[in-house]
Amino acid sequence: MHAVVVNVEIDDPDAARKGLEDLVPTIEQAPGFVAGYWIRLDDRHGISVVIFEAEDQARAGAPPADGTAPGVKMTGVAVGEVLASA
């Protein structure tokens, strides 16, 4: 399994929440999707971790590193191998 980890700065919390309502069903339909978690760290920062079955699927599902989404600015995007889960 491979994970897509995205760090964001939250500019508009209401728009960000609405954007997630639209985004999550789309991500769930992506090839190889296993699980996804969107986490608010504080009022201005968040992180998401989306797990895919294979590296190529994770890379295909990763947003551009300099991308934006409603209410957020992406500050980092990485794809890595999942070494363990519980």
Over which residues does each language-model region extend?
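Short S/T/G/P-rich N-terminal loop/turn motif that feeds into the first structured element of a domain
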Residues: 1-47, 53-86
